[in-house]
């Protein structure tokens, strides 16, 4: 049995302004005309645009996510940090965790804390896994992925709210 449902995740990175949100109209039109009603689209704009994008896609199947989050779930004096509560209150449905551009500054234990924080607030997680070029060249792919998944999912009881992105 094959699963023909696809999930398209648009990570805007550090791009986009409020004026760019109107471009989502093309996606909404495409979804309405699409024969496969099970495909899913998730937009992950910069934090500053999450609520605006969420407002734009209300009454559609399109979901909205954040590009990262703090491992800390509490409020406090953490300049520049965004926790899962703030993402949820802005309208986020998903959060990207462990993206390669950030993973090199974090370890698997921090990734695990972020996953726990996101799931606690009922956010779905897009867990990015993958090896570096050097690890691939040294035939370490399997061991790296195994480590990232094993430590990243430590004490996670259910993985049905986690999407793995490689």
Label each residue range with its predicted role.
Residues 1-166:
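Active-site loop-to-helix "anion-binding N-cap" substructures in soluble metabolic enzymes
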């Amino acid at each position: 049995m094959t699963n023909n449902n696809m999930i398209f995740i648009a990570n805007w990175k550090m791009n986009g302004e409020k004026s760019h949100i109107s471009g989502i109209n093309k996606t909404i039109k495409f979804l309405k005309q699409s024969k496969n009603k099970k495909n899913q689209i998730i937009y992950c704009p910069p934090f500053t645009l999450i609520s605006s994008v969420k407002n734009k896609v209300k009454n559609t199947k399109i979901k909205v996510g954040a590009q990262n989050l703090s491992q800390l779930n509490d409020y406090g004096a953490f300049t520049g940090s965004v926790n899962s509560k703030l993402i949820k209150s802005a309208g986020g449905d998903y959060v990207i965790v462990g993206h390669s551009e950030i993973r090199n500054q974090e370890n698997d234990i921090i990734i695990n804390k972020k996953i726990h924080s996101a799931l606690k607030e009922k956010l779905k997680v897009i867990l990015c896994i993958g090896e570096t070029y050097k690890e691939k060249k040294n035939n370490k792919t399997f061991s790296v992925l195994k480590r990232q998944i094993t430590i990243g999912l430590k004490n996670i009881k259910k993985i049905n709210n986690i999407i793995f992105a490689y």
